[in-house]
Amino acid sequence: MAEKYNLVTIVVSPLIALMNDQVDQLRREHGISIAACINSSMSIEERRDVISQIHTGQKSLLYLAPELLLTTHLQSFLGGRQVGMVVIDEAHTVTSWGRDFRSDYWFLGDFLKRTSRDGLSFPVLCLTATAVYSGDNDVVNDTIRELGLGKTIIHLGNVKRSNISFDIQRHDPAQIVGRLDDAKLNLTLKRMKAYIASGEKVLAYFPYRSQVDQIYSLISSADHIKLRRYHGQIPSPERKMTERDYKEGTAMGLFCTKAFGMGVDVGDIKHVVHFAPTGTLSDYVQEIGRAARNTEIQGIAHIDYFPSDLRYVRSLNGISEMRQYQLREMLKKIC
């Protein structure tokens, strides 16, 4: 579309790490240089440079977070060019995140309707590997309704990962001496160090940024080469360096939140450890799916489970906040 018609494809992507990973892979592995992203990790100058390259036709595949797409006039990105397609990557987030975590996802349908009223016409492609189809939890048709897509073509594939097994260890809190959270941190750290000592790459998910920082503070400075941390509040240069070193194998273990998650393709991760149960089943499937992307590897999903761990799920579900204008729009939908 870009070469023949000078059209721009916009990809709505949920995570900075995912945007960076996909743009890098397109360039490095497929020789596609027209892709770029704009996100909060970039400086004003870097953003302006990407927008300039879109305007001049040097770039034609643009990755954006929904928050930026909904709060910026579309033509400021396009510079007179037209949209050829909108791709919503990890489309299950429209419903699973839009209602309780990142409410801007819930308003993508309104954005599509507005652009249609403005005379713009383009196909919408939704991609996900974790959406339930049919039944009580029908994410596929729920997403179609939320986006107002109308008549659609649905392609279903097999997403079962036979090369991931599960290691679930249930613990009795009565056997723990001291604070439970401290014991859980030590269990997780012990696992991480053991896997790294065996030369096996490992990823550990935590519900909160504070827990990532806390466990990172427990390791010595000498261990900072092999063990890294990743969450949304870490400065952009450090995040980018961590992404690169983890892919290349300089770093072998990563403490992270879901900011490093869905779609990120690091082929040689053998172990995915959960400090506690994640927010939703879709989130969990996405997170353990980081293991064994190379199908020749047998991946393992681990969790040291305590009955009180469900408090994290309840807490995460209550964290999200909606802006005033979103509350007004939501009331319009309901009424």
List each model region and its residues.
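Post-DEXD/H (motif II) to motif III coupling segment of the RecA-like Helicase ATP-binding lobe
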Residues: 79-80, 84-85, 92-156
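Conserved helix/coil segment N-terminal to the catalytic DExD/H
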Residues: 24, 42-85, 93-99
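Conserved interdomain linker/interface between the two RecA-like ATPase lobes of SF2 helicase motors
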Residues: 152-213
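Conserved RecA-like helicase motor-core motifs
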Residues: 31-42, 150-156, 203, 222-237
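Catalytic P-loop NTPase motifs of RecA-like helicase/translocase cores
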Residues: 18-19, 69-70, 93-102, 133-135, ...
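Loop/turn-to-beta-strand initiation segments
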Residues: 7-9, 58-62, 82-85, 119-125, ...
